[in-house]
């Protein structure tokens, strides 16, 4: 299982690098308007990173719940990914906040989006910290998998349904 996670991580890293290159090559990464600059940063960098961290935590947590055992390496891997997730989530929140400050017309929708996004992500973080890392393996692996999948899908859905259209409007 560990080898497939490592291979998947490499593949996603290359895909994210290609996404960043697209933003750079198209001039989007350096948009001069603060509101679109920060929203683009969220779409190109922060949100995909959160999605990737959640994906890794989904795999790690599901594995632990399936085996009903938490080894030292798994504990370490989950802890590292939780730390990385918190950094990525902070970057998302900062991008949304800065975009809202730069464009008060976006404030209410971005605050709502931030609240929804944090609520879903925090469900995953809380379960990992309060249950799995403390040796509570009662949750069914499929239920955990589904919970994390909801958070991942929401991050991409909100990006495609709300952030990208907002960026497109700002760039016109």
Residue ranges and their predicted role:
Residues 1-172:
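Hydrophobic alpha-helical segments
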């Amino acid at each position: 299982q560990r080898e497939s996670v490592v291979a998947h991580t490499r593949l996603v890293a290359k895909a994210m690098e290609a996404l960043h290159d697209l933003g750079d090559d198209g001039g989007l990464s350096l948009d001069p308007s603060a509101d679109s600059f920060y929203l683009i940063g969220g779409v190109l960098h922060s949100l995909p990173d959160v999605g990737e961290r959640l994906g890794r935590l989904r795999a790690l947590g599901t594995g632990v719940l399936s085996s009903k055992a938490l080894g030292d390496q798994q504990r370490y891997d989950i802890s590292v990914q939780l730390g990385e997730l918190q950094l990525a989530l902070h970057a998302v929140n900062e991008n949304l906040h800065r975009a809202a400050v730069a464009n008060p017309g976006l404030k209410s929708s971005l605050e709502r989006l931030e609240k929804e996004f944090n609520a879903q992500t925090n469900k995953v973080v809380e379960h990992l910290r309060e249950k799995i890392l403390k040796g509570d393996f009662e949750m069914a692996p499929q239920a955990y998998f589904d919970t994390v999948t909801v958070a991942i899908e929401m991050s991409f859905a909100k990006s495609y349904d709300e952030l990208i259209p907002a960026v497109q409007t700002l760039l016109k």
